[in-house]
UniProtKB/Swiss-Prot annotation:
Domain called CMP/dCMP-type deaminase: residue spans: 1-116
Chain residues that bind Zn(2+): H48, C78, C81
Keyword Metal-binding: yes
Subunit-level organization: Homodimer.
Residues annotated as catalytic: E50
Keyword Hydrolase (UniProt): yes
The entry's keywords: Hydrolase, Metal-binding, tRNA processing, Zinc
Entry note: cofactor: Binds 1 zinc ion per subunit.
Name used for this protein in its record: tRNA-specific adenosine deaminase
Gene3D superfamilies cross-referenced by the UniProt entry: Cytidine Deaminase, domain 2 (3.40.140.10)
Source organism: Rickettsia bellii (strain RML369-C)
Family matches, as Pfam families: MafB19-deam (PF14437)
GO terms assigned for molecular function: tRNA-specific adenosine-34 deaminase activity; zinc ion binding
EC code: 3.5.4.33
Amino acid sequence: MREALKQAEIAFSKNEVPVGAVIVDRENQKIISKSYNNTEEKNNALYHAEIIAINEACRIISSKNLSDYDIYVTLEPCAMCAAAIAHSRLKRLFYGASDSKHGAVESNLRYFNSKACFHRPEIYSGIFAEDSALLMKGFFKKIRD
């Protein structure tokens, strides 16, 4: 999760919503991909940290099946990212801060509990939640000032 926080800090420095994601091989605990939100620079709403990390991981291992991998994200995934996590079959999801507005894991939609979801990862929340929340608060304060 520390590396995901570093990625979120990079996003913050680039005036992107500070979310970072890291995908880790469960067998050897090595990071295979890492990313941060990049929607502003790419001018594309799909460039969330999770989507970029999943795309890169699939490219690296030449497979759409990430069942031997875990994802660490600084913020509770939105519906789009939760669906991508399910479709790529990531084994475990670790996330930091809850997202009361757009979170789709435990805060609002609860995508993984829906009938539309065919794969439910193990979910662990609250990992470095305070650090993640402080980054988010700092970012939105910065853009309001």
